[in-house]
């Protein structure tokens, strides 16, 4: 009698799906979806409509996963030379370049159709523009062309709150752009801190990250300046009446913490501080947007 098929009897199938899932950068996409959700919620004074909520999150997630897979594909050579990324699916041969391209194309196409049909064309095209901005303009060109790669390319990564806003309103709004500004200013210190820690690897693969081209001390100064600019930007939702006291308190505490970590990085010679700044920046963004969400429903 033939044995029934199961995933456990075919571990290679399970490993293959894990490789494709890994290429979508699920942790990065999860944080991005939080900012999308906050954009949606802040756009609506009442409960979110189900269809644009579900379709918007699903479609944006799929297109973000597609962009991440294209990033894996384009960076496969340098990924194989860096300790942080050498174990990714393409450098290890777990997924071929052809299959990675087909996977990214299929995932992105499905996401676009979902957004276009079940959300609105505006959100579909804006998300597509973000995909092109991240996967092609940033990854394929800017990353290798200029030490300001993160600053210029960061605009594509700052779009999610706007995508969430348009998904439920089908229109632009100045408040959504404030959220974009916050993420835009958050991105450089976040990535530059990682680049300081990995500067030798970036130099090895000829990626002109700021610590490689301008030195560590200059980069530390830039991180500190950007955290101060970010702190100012984080106050804008309060100043325009978009958010209330709860967000103001949380934002002030988080900004103070971020500036303190950046100050430590600049003026204390301590091993591991760059990665502390990098990790703190992730918590900063996550908690900041959670505070925006909670404040919206408590003070709306």
UniProtKB/Swiss-Prot annotation:
Pfam families: UbiA (PF01040). CDD domains: PT_UbiA_Cox10. Signal peptide: none annotated. Its EC number is 2.5.1.141. InterPro entries: Protohaem_IX_farnesylTrfase, UbiA_prenyltransferase, UbiA_prenylTrfase_CS, UbiA_sf. One of its GO terms (molecular function) is protoheme IX farnesyltransferase activity. It comes from the Bacteria. It is a multi-pass membrane protein. It is found in: Cell inner membrane. Belongs to the UbiA prenyltransferase family. Protoheme IX farnesyltransferase subfamily. PANTHER family: 4-HYDROXYBENZOATE SOLANESYLTRANSFERASE (PTHR43448:SF7), PROTOHEME IX FARNESYLTRANSFERASE, MITOCHONDRIAL (PTHR43448). Carbon 2 of the heme B porphyrin ring is defined according to the Fischer nomenclature. Converts heme B (protoheme IX) to heme O by substitution of the vinyl group on carbon 2 of heme B porphyrin ring with a hydroxyethyl farnesyl side group. This is Protoheme IX farnesyltransferase 1. It comes from Shewanella sp. (strain MR-7).
